Amino acid sequence: RENVIDYSLLEFCLREDLNKTAPRVMAVLDPVKVVITNYPAGKEEWLDAENNQEDESAGFRKVPFSRELYIEREDFLEEAPAKFFRLSLGKEVRLKNAYIIKGESVVIDANGNITEIHVSYDEDSRSGSGSEASQRKVSGTLHWVSIAHAVEAEVRLYDRLFIDEAPDSHKEKNF
């Protein structure tokens, strides 16, 4: 009997299993530098981050936070449309397990590329603090890494192996 299972079912099953067992870390694949202008130079904090949101028994890990961070380049637009739920100038977002930041200005190189984003942070908005500022609603939450503590890593991004949903249905092609 021939059987073709939808790829999205496999992805769903993998996600379900990994959500229960995989340790969480933050990585930035296409970094842009963020400078928190009102955060003291030389200061660093070790913030608590859940090891697994779906398993309280997994505990917490410490994540370093400092004045200079990396975020994903795609998480920032200088002039963002209304439905952009990430960082832009004049807009607030939360840094995961950290603080609320607001885009203030950018540094652009000779080729027109953004090389730095300058932001301010709300010192009272630390995640989990229970303060009124920490419970403020913002448009999105971004993952990040502290530049001073970043390590290089090899990342393998996998996608679908075949373009066709049912590659074996083409008898003239050799798969």
Give the predicted meaning of each segment.
Residues 1-175:
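Basic, alpha-helical terminal appendages of large translation-related enzymes
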